[in-house]
Amino acid sequence: MLGSTANKEKFIETQEEEKQYPENFESWHDANADQPQFPNQIHHQTEELKSIFSKQERLAMARQEIQALKIEWQHYLQEFGTKEVTLKQRKSSSSADLLNLWNECQQFAEKEQSSSLRGIAAFIQRLKWLFFKFRSKAICKIPDKGFYKREMSLIIADFQILFYQTKYAELEVEIDTLEKELANKDAAEMARQMADTSMKYLKNQLFHTYGNNHDKPIFTLPDLRNNWREVQKEYPIILSTTFSSLSSLQRDAVYDYIIMDEASQVSVETGALALSCAKNAIIVGDTMQLPNVVTEEDKEKLNFIANACLIKPEYDCANMSFLQSICKVIPNVPQTLLREHYRCHPRIINFCNQKFYGGDLVIMTRDKGEEDVICAIRTAKGNHSRSHMNQREIDVIKEEVLPNLSYETDEIGVIAPYNKQVDAVKSALEEDIDVATVHKFQGREKDAIIMTTVDDVITSFSDDPNLLNVAVSRAKSQFYLVVSGNEQPKDCNISDLIAYIEYNNGTVSTSKIHSIFDYLYEQYTDARIAYLKKHKKISEYDSENLTFALLEDILKENINMRHLNIICHLPLYMLIQDYSLLNEEESKYAANINTHIDFLIYNRVSKQPVLAIETDGYTFHKSGTNQSERDIKKDRILELYGIPLVRLSTIGSNEKKIIR
């Protein structure tokens, strides 16, 4: 460990005492490891483990998927009621087949509404319908001839319900198959064997480098500067802080690689210093973890320098960490997401997964159906916060939360955004309970975490996304949120957490709109986009494809939109739950199966709509047409239910700017 002057002096002083080669160094030599085929053995073991790890990962994803499907199915039944479905799946069919039938049904419903089909076109449409019925009978057991004489919305609902059931059964089979395959493989033992083989190879290489009467040089302090190449040969790995990395050895010293950990907490200027002494760099960090702290005094100085020297925004030392800067300066730098998560209960970490990581994490822990894994407790309404301290929330923690926790006190943590609340909680609770701000909890974990938000109305400070991500992900087994019962802003992160908790705990929504059945409609969206790609010659489909691609690009480009997703062609009746705001004509229009939203951007955490987008063909939607009148109705309905709407014309421009 070098870096600071004190570290270097300590290294020199203790070098002779601590720098000892192993007494049995000769035993490190392994004749087998000298053989050319020995690395191939390691490669073979690695490939075997890769295969097992891949199956373990897929098993975790399947468990994650079936849990999401199960929760969504419960909400579907709560919001639409139970219904006997007479459709039965044939053994040779799959959930993908049912999605295709649903998609085709929707196309027929749209054509049916059109009065423009005449003569040969109408005849061809009838033939297509007959062929569809024949094909659907090969996929499903249709109960009777009257099945297809019903309203198309009822037929589609049957396909949706059968899809849920079929997909659930498919996932159960996949999980069972993977569990049986993995039961016959001892991954831990195979990993141990590979580690042993790799260690033999490493030790053998170290023996050839440092054994065989290799002189053990003892360096002086000036050697670190004047003889740095020899120091590097003897000590190929050097530890240092980013700030001191340049001065660990001579300033001209160059390293093959620099590995920078916790880069989200490194300042831009010190990170740049560290880069200047390496040929290659591996930057490790998480932009959704807490960034480095910059004091107000330093911010003022850094902003002055930035303005005076015309420093580009992507090098903003006052407001960005080194990791954020790297991502902006080199947006196409190769990135690897460490996807596997082993700490938290699935229901806890999946909030962070959906909110901050776009659903890309693979949750390797198991959900065994435990109760009260993630809970929110609202205090009574009122102004209970005083100077960043909230006694009412402390009382709730002491009297309602802690009695329900069965862990040892040293396995419980309380997180607060303000030091005054931390001090007050410490005074009220047992000494063994760890109470601190989020910054002091980063890198740690507890069986149970209690988060007190303090503010009567959530502020930008207590709602900071990085703070919330770290706070939630400290909890291994249970997480409690204690929050004011006052109405909170709907678009804040804490509100998303509350909505996530309520949804996953099966709370029945009292909203006038349905929660978004994203598992169902994400699958449908994939099927529809695949269908549209086969019909690019039809202009309306082409515009839908282009809009979908545009929306995907917008969401991918913005890190703050990771919690958003897109579904297409959502019927309005799947969105409107309470028709009391509508008149008779509007209700009839909203309930029509063909009244749909072209694209809906929704919050994958709260399952609530964020923005509706319509793609309007100029001729079809121009003023005075029947479609224009329907557009006015749809605009009014969405406005009544507080759902923002953007209309994009096929002859318009600046679509990306309009949507953002």
Which residues fall in each region the model found?
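ASCE P-loop NTPase helicase motor core
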Residues: 1, 20, 121-140, 144, ...
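Long, amphipathic, heptad-repeat alpha-helical coiled-coil stalk/linker regions
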Residues: 1-160
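Conserved motor-coupling elements within RecA-like helicase/translocase cores
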Residues: 226-235, 435-456
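Conserved helicase/translocase motor-coupling segment
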Residues: 358-428
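Nucleic-acid endo/exonuclease domains
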Residues: 512-660
